[in-house]
From Swiss-Prot:
Location of this chain's protein in the cell: Carboxysome
Cofactor note: Binds 1 Mg(2+) ion per subunit.
Pfam families: RuBisCO_large, RuBisCO_large_N
Binding residue positions for Mg(2+): K194, D196, E197
Organism of provenance: Hydrogenovibrio marinus
Protein name: Ribulose bisphosphate carboxylase large chain 2
Other observations noted: The basic functional RuBisCO is composed of a large chain homodimer in a 'head-to-tail' conformation. In form I RuBisCO this homodimer is arranged in a barrel-like tetramer with the small subunits forming a tetrameric 'cap' on each end of the 'barrel'.
GO terms for MF: magnesium ion binding; monooxygenase activity; ribulose-bisphosphate carboxylase activity
Binding positions for substrate per the UniProt entry: N116, T166, K170, R288, H320, S372
Induction record: Both mRNA and protein accumulate at 0.15% and 0.03% CO(2), but not at 15% or 2% CO(2) (at protein level).
Amino acid sequence: MASKTFDAGVQDYQLTYWTPDYTPLDTDLLACFKVVPQEGVPREEAAAAVAAESSTGTWTTVWTDLLTDMEFFKGRAYRIEDVPGDKNAFYAFIAYPLDLFEEGSVVNVLTSLVGNVFGFKAVRSLRLEDLRFPIAFIKTCGGPPSGIQVERDKLNKYGRPMLGCTIKPKLGLSAKNYGRAVYECLRGGLDLTKDDENINSQPFQRWRDRFEFVAEAVDKATAETGERKGHYLNVTAGTVEEMMKRAEFAKELGQPIIMHDFLTAGFTANTTLANWCRENGMLLHIHRAMHAVIDRNPLHGIHFRVLAKCLRLSGGDHLHTGTVVGKLEGDRASTLGFVDQLRESFVPEDRSRGVFFDQDWGSMPGVMAVASGGIHVWHMPALVNIFGDDSVLQFGGGTQGHPGGNAAGAAANRVALEACVKARNEGRDLEREGGDILREAARTSKELAVALETWKEIKFEFDTVDKLDVQ
C-alpha cells in the first residue's frame, strides 16, 4: 500500500470492478442482478458500475483510497449472462467480501446492495434476482424463532398442512364480533385463524380489546375440540416500543403465536421481534404486505426469493408465499423455488425455478410456507400437491363465505384437506383426480357439498406478470 499513488479524476468502473477471471470464495456474498444499461453503456461498464456503487466505489477517484486495501474490499463483477428472450437486459454476477457487512444484519446487506445503486444513471433499470449468503454470515443470524418441527411439537399437528383463515371483513368488526368469528372458525375445524395485515389498533377495534376477545375464543375452541388452536395476533405498530408492548400482552394471555408485517415495519423491527419470540417461546407469523411494490416489476426492484431469504435470516416461523392457483400473482416454478429457500437446509442452483446459486442454510430451522389469497375448496388438491405438509393453507373468504357460516366453511375445508391427504398417501394423483376426490368426500359431508356447489365457477385465470426468464 505504501507504493500507491493518487491519480485524481474519473476512471471507467470496469478498470477496477470488472474482474472476469475472479473465482468467488466460499465466504463471499454473491448477487445476481438483472441490468438494463442506458443506451451506449457497455455491459461490462454497467456491471462494474453496479459492483462499485454497491460496495466501495464513488463517482471519482479519492485520495483516501490510499488509506485502505481497496483490492480486498471492493465488489467484483465476475460474470455476465444473457437474459433469455430479452435483448436489452443481462445478468450481472457480483461477489462481495464478507467483511463489507455487519454480522447478523440483513439491514446492512440490503442498504449496500439495494441502496443508492438503484438510482444510478448508468442503468435504466435494475433488479436483484438472487443472493447467495455464505454460511459464515448465516451463522451470525438468529433465523426463525422456533422453526417447523418445534411448531409442530407445540401445536401437536403432524402429517398434513395446517389449516387457517383470515378473519373477514378485514376492517370494521368490533372486538367482540371479531372474537366470535374466530371461535366459529376454530370450533368448526381450523387449526389457526389470523388478523389481516392492516388490523392494528383502529378506533373501531383497539388492539387490547381484540387480543382479549380472541384469547377467549381460542381457549374456548381448544377446550371444546381437544385440539391445540391459535390465532395470529398482529402486533405491528407505529413504534418498536408499542409493538413489543403488544407482544408482551399476547404472552400474558397465554397465546402461542403473534404476527408481524415485516416489510412495512422494517427488518430492524422484525429481527427485534423475532429475537424476543425466541427468548419467550412464541411463534411468529410473517405477512408480506408491500412486497408487490418491490418485487412485481420483472425489470426493476427485488425478486421475492431475495426477500424470502432475508426473512428467514431475520426471523419468522411462517411467511406468506402466494398460492399459484388463487387471486394473487405467483408463477408456479418460481414459487416452488423460494418455498424451497424457506424450508430446506440446502437448495441447489436450478434456473428452471429461478435459483441462481447453491444455498447452504446449515442448521438454521425452516419457515412454514403460507398459501393465502382467493382460494377455496376446489383448490385444495392442487394446494396440497404444490405446498406439501410443511405449509399453512389459509381460506379467508373460502371459509367465511360459506352459506352455512364460518363453522360450516371451516368444516368443509377440514374434510377437503383430510380427504386430499388421505388420497395422496394412498398414491392417487391429486391434481388429475382432485375433483373426484372432493366429490367422494362430499357424499358424507353436507358442508363440503355446499362449498363445492358455491364455488364451482370461481376461477382467477390471469397471466403471471413476473415470469421466470427461461426458454
